[in-house]
Amino acid sequence: VFEGAENAPYGWALRDAETGAVRFGEYAEEDLGRCMIGKIDPATRGLQVWVKEVYDCRGNRLPLETPGTNMKIYWAGDLSTQVTDGRDYLHGPKCGAVNDLTHGTMLMPSGTATNNGTKGNPCLVADIFGDFREELLLRLEDDSAIRIYTSTDLTHHKLFTLLHDPQYRCGVAWQNNCYNQPGYPSFYYASDMDFANVLPQLRARPTVYLAADSTVQSYTEAEAPQTGWGQPLWRRPRGANL
């Protein structure tokens, strides 16, 4: 877990999610505001973290320009991470541009405005239309409407909508509270990801229609609530890899 803190001894730190032990971090005398994590450098293994500077997953400082920390977004088709807004837009409700460390500015949504002053948050970032890229929701400058932007960046990757992941779905809900931090999927999302590790518990189960209450559930035949409940809508072939 990568966190930006307000007090000593750590101004920011990467902690073990299970134990809370610090893997690496740095002292800071002041509140550093916000921090972020994502795949912004395709040449570096794993994810990168940044607050004042950019670091790799082992805590080594990288010679990269530090992106903004307003909100991350999965916008590009190469499974990398982008940010909405940035350092040029911290002085008021400016438009929520989508910036990328290698691709440059990928979207400049003119006529829109961000929220929460210096935090520069969009109304929402979420994968609401399917695909695996996220949509960007921004209000118009005159507050007359909300505009939805979706990526047109071509991709050869195929992945179901991120809302199938329970952790990501919860993250979309908490985006609208307090500091509006981005949600992340429970699996490793990056340009070097192994698709075999994406929600294996969903791939390994047939989907069964339960006629008793008209709902769709997913379980193996051995786990059926009682004999004769439902018929499989789709049965995973033996030995199939999806």
Please state what every model-predicted region is.
Residues 202-242:
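Serine-esterase "nucleophile elbow" of acetyl-processing enzymes
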Residues 1-200:
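Extracytoplasmic/lumenal domain signature
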